[in-house]
Amino acid sequence: MKKFALSVGSVALAIFSFLYIQLYRVQSSIGEQLAQQNIAVQSINLSLFPPALSLENIKTTQFSVQKLEAKLNFLPLFYGNAKLHSLNLQQITLNQNTQNSANISMDLAPFSLNQLLSQKVMLNGESHIRVEFDKPIYGNKTFNFTFNKANLDFSKSKSALIQFVNASLNNQPLGYIETHADFRSPRQQMVTYIKPMCDNDCLAVLKYQQIDNQSEVNFSGKYFPVKRLFALLNLPEVLNGHADFNIDFTFLHSQLIQGKLNILAQNGEILGVNLLDMVSQYFPINYNGDLLQNKELNTRFEQFYLQLFLQQNQLIAEKIELKTPALLGQGKGIIDLNRMECNMDINLHSTDQRYQNLTLPINFFGNCSSPQYKINFTKKFRHQLIDAIKEKLR
């Protein structure tokens, strides 16, 4: 019995020794690779139970990380092929003057540590990335990104290639994403193409450029689904259809300081409001049955144009233009991004030339998804209404 116990103990000791040797080799390989790439690390630690890798105070010319923790798969260690399936990065910042850091947690399809060290990673399987900023960006602190496949190639000196398949951000499907980036030059640049599944040739392009402490983002697209666009922009879901858009954001020390948005939505609906049914109560117009048969709380439109700019936690709508078969509208307003409340003043006109001088002023307020409204019965509107009724009775 003692011999048996001694034999078992010897085998266990041999296995543990072998595993620790493997871990030591992994640790040495990591240290060598980091030194070759001019990445400074204060300490590298490996543990066996559970298999994990920890790096502290990582610094490069592009970013710094206070702590990186990686979880390893146990069995591949026997073959000298360490595989990772989880990464956590604490207090990551893009440069020393950045005033907004982030924590990133990743649950990934298992991949080889050798791939990571060679800067070419292939991921096959469902993966999740969660990014949480210390300070909100555009009213949001947390971003959840998922995908089924990925190719991450940072091996070239001047350009990185990043590809995602079946990607989604904050539960909004984005489809295929391809990014070309240069983070090593003084003027860091990135171009991302987003190709979602849609019933037309839709495409969005995200351009990023950073010079010193200031960065600029341009986000533009053609025939892009409005619902997905508004979800990405953290806007209330008030429209559907497809949109052409052009958006510019400026950041200083990673804080958003300026934003301009131009969005032209086409062939969609205003959700939660039936303007035609509302207007028919006040305009002396006999709309045909086809226009009034849709009694749901939506308004179909041909075009809906928004020109907005960002002011702290509010979006100021400088210009709102609406075109439907029966109505034309112009207006302006404010969207509170923190409370998702809207205050919009819209002037509605009939497309019927006989009533082109009659303007119905409406104020929408409260929750953007289900707003309340009031008609501004000004003296001017009363005179217009009286004149329109007289004209109709002639």
Where are these regions (language model features)?
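Hydrophobic membrane-insertion alpha-helices, especially the h-region
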Residues: A5-L19
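Terminal hydrophobic membrane-targeting helix
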Residues: I15-T98, I362
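N-terminal secretory/membrane-targeting helices
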Residues: S28, A35, Q42, Q99-Q119, ...
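Extracytoplasmic/secreted proteins and extracellular or luminal domains
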Residues: Q37, T61, G80, M122-L123, ...
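Small-residue helix/turn framework positions
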Residues: A52, N57-K59, L84-P110, S127-I137, ...
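Extended beta-solenoid/beta-helix repeat architectures
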Residues: T146-K149, I177
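Short, solvent-exposed mixed-charge patches
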Residues: L393-R394
